[in-house]
């Protein structure tokens, strides 16, 4: 498994905790590859990374955004499977081990799991599947974040993240899903998502939110352009996802232009 960790402005303690959560898994050095893509951070964490493991692949590049940082990681990935992790998050060992067992013992292209805002998580149930990614999208609400997916590298082909935008996951993830022929999914919470003030998804600057909405609109346009070229089943799945994202966009526009307390009361 190639673990692609993107790093920009996260506190070093969080990055080290992230890497340690990968090292804690039941994978030996030949079964894992840890890639840290430094997207132009003010301080290089290379010394701290070497102290954790001498086998970490570290690359530092000028700030180009999360999408391009992940693309860099993809080009360096040597594992059969890929797992993306943001540098301030971490994997929850017991639940993630279930995902590893699935790729070890079953023929699968992708394992979907849940995220948690708590660091402790225990496996709750067996995974369901296999089904196709198309079938999953047709009957389930898809989480945008690609970080809750462990997937086979070869299904990517030429698929990459869009560069220089927010909402890069919303464009990338549904296209990735359509490429998965054998998918397992579980409600187990294997990914700890840290809600941190100052992180990219918790900014309060109005200009940032306006840019976020503009980028989301462009993502919708680009996904819609691809629909006409898809086979019938894939088209139905993608149209359902576009409808979900459109409703999210409408809600977020209303939130930005109206009083949020009043909006939540009405809803």
Which role does the model predict for each range below?
Residues 194-267:
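C-terminal subregions of glycosyltransferases and related glycan-biosynthesis enzymes
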